[in-house]
């Protein structure tokens, strides 16, 4: 019984952390109207589109400022803006895998 309580408590804590992270992400994504409540799915999809937009803007600014494309990746995660695939064809993150800690690991 104690193990079940511990497992339930850990799952509740994990779900609260996930929900908190989504709430923070929702605040960073511009929406119209501004107070629109987004589902988790909508939040992730809009976040990917917004990241794509920002990377393209940074890539274009880099091209305008230097006359050539900036070397390397932005934050080491994404290719340069002008070379990103369109969201219609595939998502930005499909080729990028982040290692996941096991269920017993805690990331501060």
Curated annotation (Swiss-Prot):
Question: Which SMART domains does its entry note?
Answer: HLH
Task: Enumerate the Gene3D superfamilies for this protein.
Answer: Helix-loop-helix DNA-binding domain (4.10.280.10)
- Region of interest (Disordered), residue spans: 89-108
Show which residues constitute the signal peptide: none
Q: Where is the bHLH domain?
A: 2-54
Q: Which SUPFAM superfamilies match?
A: HLH, helix-loop-helix DNA-binding domain
Q: Where does it sit, as one GO cellular component term?
A: chromatin
All disulfide bonds of the chain are none
The cross-references to InterPro entries, in alphabetical order and at most eight, read: bHLH_dom (IPR011598), HLH_DNA-bd_sf (IPR036638), TAL-like (IPR040238)
Give an example GO biological process.
Answer: multicellular organism growth
What GO MF annotations does this protein's record show? DNA binding; DNA-binding transcription factor activity, RNA polymerase II-specific; protein dimerization activity; RNA polymerase II cis-regulatory region sequence-specific DNA binding
Keywords in alphabetical order, please: Chromosomal rearrangement, DNA-binding, Proto-oncogene, Transcription, Transcription regulation
Q: Which disease is it linked to?
A: A chromosomal aberration involving TAL2 may be a cause of some T-cell acute lymphoblastic leukemia (T-ALL). Translocation t(7;9)(q34;q32) with TCRB.
Note the PANTHER family from the entry.
Answer: T-CELL ACUTE LYMPHOCYTIC LEUKEMIA PROTEIN 2 (PTHR13864:SF21), T-CELL ACUTE LYMPHOCYTIC LEUKEMIA/STEM CELL LEUKEMIA-RELATED (PTHR13864)
Name of the featured protein: T-cell acute lymphocytic leukemia protein 2
Native source species: Homo sapiens
Species lineage, top-down? Eukaryota, Metazoa, Chordata, Craniata, Vertebrata
Gene behind this protein: TAL2
